[in-house]
Each structure stands twice: as structure tokens, then as C-alpha cells.
Amino acid sequence: LIFRTQNEKDLAVTKRIEEVHKTGQPILVFTSSINKSEHYSDLLNKKGVKHLVLNAKNHEREAEIIANAGKKNSVIITTSISGRGVDIKLGGKNEINDDKTVIKKLGGLCVVGTERLESRRVDNQARGRSGRQGDIGESIFFLSLEDDLMRIFGSKTLESVLGKLGLKEGEAITHSLITRSLERAQQKVESHNYDLRKQILRFDDILNDQRKIIYQNR
């Protein structure tokens, strides 16, 4: 779902989390940074939604927190890099069958993405947190034209598209053109990052050659 402004998106994110949380369905909220995770934590605190924040500031319990993300009433806000390699069990890490059955009836784990990230691979990893190994689950991404990725690439074009489609304030839209534009933006970032890594490796090779010459002359 894409909105015009960050504020409109934030209202939609918190509303969705509130609605899902009332049912008891577990929720895992993905953000792009520590600042963003704390931003959404503040919004949920104002709504009285109990939750945990998992980021680099409290990573000691990372594996335990992520492993229990599938428990009833669980709401966890995390950054995109947290909990890699940790399986999320519906009903919690103890895998009690009755608890798992309850969570399945509620719809499994609900993954909420608060923006599209710079890498399609990371986006897919976030989506893949729900519906693992045949379990039921759902994922939804909330975007705005003021997101970092959108501001850097393609927001003017998308703004024009949204205007032509008659999008009103507070309304959201999904459209194949928007999806393609986002994927192109991510490809540009991935290509840029790849070029940077190649340059760094090239400089490393030069430095290593210089070190060898210095050692040989000693």
C-alpha cells in the first residue's frame, strides 16, 4: 500500500497493528533503522499497544525474542538485520500444539513492513518470516512517497501517477507501475552498492601490493 506522506502511512500502520493485535494474532514489524524502530514504538505507546523493540541497543536477547515472535498477542518491532537464522514457531519456541493451533486459526504470523528496503533480497527475507515451512501467515508493506528509497528514486514520477489516478489524502493504492518503479529503484541501489564493493576490493588489492613491496625492501 502506498500513501502520499509519511504521516498518512504512519496512521495506516498503527491502525493496522491495532486492529490485528485486538485479535491476538502475532505481529512482526520491520523497520529500516534504529531510529525508525523507535519512531514506531512511540506511535504504538501512544495507542497503548504493548510491544517489544528489538534493535542494536538490546540485541542480547535477540534470538529468544525472535523465536517467540509467533506467540499470541506478541508485537515485536525490529530492524531488517535482526534475527537472521532464527526460526519463528507459531505459538512460541516451545511448540505447544494447542498454542500453534490457536495461532493458525488467527491467521499465523502477520509481518508488517514499514517501507521497502534498499535490497529486494532483504524485502524477501522479511516477507519470508511468515508462512514458513507451510505454516499460514501474511505480510503487507506500507509505503509513502517520503520514504528514503522513494525520495532518491522515482517519487516525482509516482506523484504524477497518483495524481492521475485521483488518489485523495489518506487513501492508499496498489498498482503494477508502482511495484515496477520500486523494483527499478532497488536495482539502482543494488548496482551502486555493488560498484562500491568492487572499488573497495580494488583499493584493498593495491594496498596489499604496496605492503608486499615494503616488506620485500626491509
What are these regions (language model features)?
Residues 2-3, 28-31, 36-39, 52-55, ...:
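Structured core elements
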Residues 1, 34-37, 58-60, 81-85, ...:
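Conserved nucleotide-binding/hydrolysis micro-motifs of P-loop NTPases
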Residues 2-28:
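Conserved interdomain hinge at the start of the Helicase C-terminal
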Residues 101-218:
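C-terminal helicase module of SF1/SF2 nucleic-acid helicases/translocases
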